[in-house]
Amino acid sequence: MADKSYDAVIIGGGHHGLVIGSYLARNGLSVGVFERRYEVGGGACTEELPFPGWVRDVHATFIRFFISPAYYDFKLWEKGLKLIFPPGATNSCLWRDGTAMAMKPLNDVKEKTMHWPYLPENLEENVKQVASFSKKDADTCYELANKYRDVWKEYVEKWHYNPPPPLGEKDLDEILIERKLVKPEWVTMDVGSVAYDVFESPQLREYYMRLAQGHIGIYPNQPQHLMLTLHTLGSMLGGLPISIAAGGTHNVAHALQRALSEQGGDFYVLSEVDKILLKNGRAVGIKLADGTEIEAKKMVVCDTHVNQVVGKFIGEANTPPEIVKKVKNLHAEVGGWWVHFALHELPKYKHEATHPGCLTQRQYNMPLEPDWFRYQQMEEANKGLLTKYIYFHLTHYSAFDPRWAPEGKHCSLVEVYGPKISQVGYDWYRKVDKELVSRIVEQWQWYAPNMTWDNVIGYHSDSVEAMGERLIDMVGNWTMIDMTNDQMGQRRPIPEYSRYRTHIDNVYICSSVMHPGGALHGLCGYNCYKRIAEDWGLEKMWEKEGRPF
């Protein structure tokens, strides 16, 4: 006899699991969420590092959780989640030669609605900045921004906010090509090839490649899905603003947990799941590592890696060999570091003389070496070489929220990509960590001369090793598996599982290994709920609310 019983059991308390748990509980189902770690949230994790008084996000940082329907359906702003939108420019690019762009958002995001006024005056201002180093690229960006707003946006949003169509039906990328709304060759191009096809200036080529890498975590010589190509092109001149969660991204998890609890759901931490209990080809519950058994009267939902679902929870013996093979062949190529610096003062960027306000929430500092970035970054990583150039993807938390550092002090986070763990091993990351941080500080001074070691109080380096251990990942990839074209849409993670249901018809997967992939947006959980609503006849709140998605 089971120790506890729920209609729906959720394995893993990451933000996707909390999203889907809240929706299921809203439908009157009894819901239990079981989390291995000491707190729920998964990648929505904030810790006091590197010293008492400083906090840092150890996973998700650059967030747009306001795009998540769960943010509105559960009124998370009433549950402790405050999103901060820095004034002025939300996104900036600083190059070693002194050129820069500080781009304002193209939409005015409002807290309590998904209808955000368009800001054409910001587009005009952003275009002028591009024109300072390429009139042709400025015209191209203007055309792309308008094409995205008028045509592509509807398709991109529909793709993100819905499960992929069943196999055999056309996906939206195919429909776009059929209707001659995009260049068909973009489908097979890698990121670098698109950059060189669309733009002429080294600045815009480099920016596009780094923006794509920041969005989905792949190298310039890897191909991304067409819908993500369109999203990246449409974001070049500002797009939606970037936000930070006041006090840390873990407050997203706190708000979702409150939503779950208010709907009547339960959650348990330090409750590692050993396996899914099966009977007559269906899931009937789970067994915890301590031997406790939990009944699942209707379904089990996994907010975990597909490797765990197949290799551990369901078990290879209970899985068709072809599915086992496909899951084992999934690839996750990109590794990296996320280094949090405690600082005496904020970086003083020399570009501020010509671009006031270029210190932004999301910022790219780049050496203006697009050919190296396109061809050599991944090649050097695969050889186990420490990256020659630091392509800074950084934020300056304390400039916009004083909760992140003691009074009068500051902090910044730097993201840098590196080789995959399967190529070099954890020992390599440990060995080169200090050298990597020294290279960051050295090259930071190309852009901000005050960023010497005298300005650094201390740092905390979080690499793929820590991420892999924290979230039980194959190689510490923040998107779980690569978001390359072969592992997206109807192919993510494998065709048989692409609509969130496994070969066990009441076992579902809702983690970032599913469509639309990694990021703190809650859409994997939301779309998994859509599939479950279809299977079980549950509430379709998007229809009741009059939302398109």
Regions found by a protein language model. Name each.
Residues 1-8, 26-27, 488-489, 540-549:
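Extreme N-terminal leader/targeting segments of oxidoreductases
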Residues 201, 205-218, 386-395, 449-515:
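A glycine-rich dinucleotide-binding beta-alpha-beta segment and adjacent secondary-structure elements
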Residues 138-170, 394-490:
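Helix-rich C-terminal "cap"/substrate-channel and partner-interaction subdomain
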Residues 510-533:
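A conserved FAD-binding loop/helix module that cradles the flavin
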Residues 266-267, 271-284, 458-473:
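Beta-rich nucleic-acid/ligand-interaction surfaces
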Residues 149-263, 270, 471-487:
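Active-site/ligand-binding neighborhood in enzyme catalytic cores
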Residues 245, 274-405:
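Mid-domain catalytic core of redox enzymes
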Residues 2-157:
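N-terminal glycine-rich phosphate/pyrophosphate-binding loop and immediately adjacent elements
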